[in-house]
Each structure stands twice: as C-alpha cells, then as structure tokens.
Amino acid sequence: YELVKAIAADGGTGVFGGRIYVAQDAQRTQAYQRNNNLLLGDAAHVYSKPQLEIYADNVKCSHGATVGRLSAEALYYMRQRGLSDRDARRLQMFGFANQVIEKIPVEGLTGTIEELAAAKIDRM
C-alpha cells in the first residue's frame, strides 16, 4: 500500500510519478497506490501519474489519484460552530496531512512530524 499526499498553495506545483512494479514470479501480490492532492488557490498545480507495471498473472493491484480543494461545506460547518475561517482551513489541511502522518511506524517520530506539518500549514 502506497499513500502519497500533497498540498499545493499559491503558485506551488506538486508532481507525483509513482510506479509499482510486480515481477513475473511475484504471483498473488496485492498492491494499491494512491495519490491525493489538495489545491489552495487558482495558481496552484499538481501533476499526478500513478503507474502499475505488472508482469505476473495472479495479482490484485490498483491505483488512483485525486485532486481537490478544501470543502466549502466543511468550512461552513466549522465556522457555524465558532471556528474562525483561518482555523477551519488549518484544521481541514491538517486532517488531510495527518492521514499520512499517523501511519508512520516509528515511535516518537509522529509527534515531531505533526509539529513540522502544523508549522508549515500555519504559514499557508
């Protein structure tokens, strides 16, 4: 399972070119590749090219990519519950990023990366 996420802001550009390779003798392989991208503003761009290169017959592999913006409905909901627009945007961005951060298997590293991500999101 491969999960790659990106947030592109202002004039930023994100590029994802991932490949899952399954050799001929790797029968019964299961693999999934996913790339999710969040655009903040009209000047941001993302180019996504997930790829599967499969030479085995008996496999279960798939891939997908999404490009989207912050949910206006979710922002509205959070503002109606007292969050400022800025905090609602930050919360939505952090939730998007945290889906990757929480999968980090190294004990003690998750908190550090959460802090770095939150600091970066605060500057967006």
How would you describe each model-predicted region?
Residues 1-124:
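Active-site gating/interface segments in enzymes
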